[in-house]
Amino acid sequence: MRTRFLFLTSGCKAVPELHKIVLANAAPVKNPEIRYASTENRNYYITTPIFYVNASPHLGHLYSAVIADCFHRHKQLQGFNSRFATGTDEHGLKIQQAAEAAGKEPLEFCTTVSERFRHLFSSCNISNTDYIRTTEQRHHRAVQHFWSVLCSKGLIYKGSYEGWYSTQDESFLTPSQVTTALDSTGKEIKVSLESGHKVEWMKEENYMFRLSGFRSQLLDWLRENPRAIQPERFHHSVLQWLQEELPDLSVSRQKSRLQWGIPVPEDDGQTIYVWLDALVNYLTVVGYPNNHERWWNVAHHIIGKDILKFHAIYWPSFLLGAGLPLPQTIHVHSHWTVAGKKMSKSLGNVIDPQERSQLFTTDGLRYFLLRQGVPDTDCDYRDDKVVKLLNAELADALGGLLNRCTATALNPAQVYASFCPDSFPRERGGRADDDDYRMLESVRHLPAVVEQHFEDMHVYKALEAVSTCVRQTNGFVQRHAPWKLDRKDSADQRWLGTIIHVSLECLRIYGTLLQPVVPEISNKLLSRLGVQPHERSWTNLNFLPRFEGKDCPFEGRALGSDSGVLFSRLESQRADQQKNRKMEKGSNLK
């Protein structure tokens, strides 16, 4: 018979499977009503996970932040009042031990690493509206209030815990989640099946949360809300986990083991479990326990797949217990690997996001992560992939199109050229061909396509759709070769203006839609077109009004003065190395 977690009321002897008997005698958990978030207002609240400060930020941390930032900017583009929180998780045994190893006080250690995250996000144009640290007093107050609410509802009781615990993961594990492995000396040790981190057998008296009473409510929530957890495969994973009974959860540690954390109210001998502490940050940011409803009703979480259980089982259960609405969506993303392997210090394959953002530009790295990152599956990172993608799509396709249509050779007047309905009539005819009409249809529907992909958390598909339209527009210009037209011929002159006008309209749509992804490049593109800041919202995505017989506010307007390159081509690492070797040889000859 398999031994389970032991969750026993104070004074009971630890016996396998006895927790069922104990719970039968304990006060029953009332089934709280599931409260769903409002979808009626124009507020939007998105969060990243708060990042653990045991080490410096890596590419995966930036990926989470870029995704959240992209959704935040997208909602702002659509006129939503958006709030975006990120920050650092600074309590727990792992931090306590890391600070001791570094010879620093825990708060000093946390502040140093937290500032690295803050600096990275600032330098990569992460536009968070709040940066939360779990060592702040506002969070301390929120966590203790949340704990007290759960206690008042009879959901926390004091008992004994005996089982496996991973300090690295700050996680309790069942026997089925543990396996045997060999350490570096060949000694047998127990490790987590999921993370591979070492686990230890722990036995202590602490506080338990009645997680076992929430399984049916969680199942109801997920079945009634099939888009609550996205992508779909992760929704199914959680449903699969819920096919088994949920054991109660230890939510505190003895202070003798863990000093670095928030004390349990009215029991200074216990410290609140780091995951309960950390998850409450999402409430702290919006003012919990006072005036939080306005924002908490529209909450969305961005998380990595490794912390799905904490966010999809523990967190909703805590919220249900506290009588609070559940988040509207939990967006889950997979991980970045290098040569198919997980990044780790021991393998020496950790990608420094700060270094790469300087190498490929901030917008370049953001574009690559969102264009290549697929939420459902792990993605492999290589520098040459970054160079190839950015050169093809940002430098050549988008940058080349802008350069062609705004160059003095084709547009000597430097204006938003005029559209001629006779050259490109609504009914097929004039000098436009079938491919041109198909291109117009693609660009006209592009905002709706992009919006749907954002709703599905498929930003990479939205960018693929934009890239396809950019290629179509380049094909349109290439087919009609406006540089070959005779400007002395009035018909050719009108057709030239029409080609440029249509191309600039396409670029305006692309620049507007790309603002959440590459804000600096989009700003440069739209400024070059003469599009003012107040003309860059979702409501301005009325494509080619002259084609519909309406006025175009941009027609005849002077273009912006910045005629610089939109995105400079990147040289491959191999080319850079060859260039450096030549320079070194040259300097040696002198």
UniProtKB/Swiss-Prot annotation:
Locations listed in the record: Mitochondrion matrix
Organism of this sequence: Takifugu rubripes (Japanese pufferfish)
Chief place of localization: mitochondrion
Lineage: superkingdom: Eukaryota
Chain residue ranges for the region called Disordered: 570-590
Documented EC number(s): 6.1.1.10
Gene that encodes the chain: mars2
Keyword Transit peptide attached: yes
GO cellular component terms given for this protein: mitochondrial matrix
Keywords for this protein: Aminoacyl-tRNA synthetase, ATP-binding, Ligase, Mitochondrion, Nucleotide-binding, Protein biosynthesis, Transit peptide
Binding-site residues for ATP, renumbered to this chain: K345
Protein name: Methionine--tRNA ligase, mitochondrial
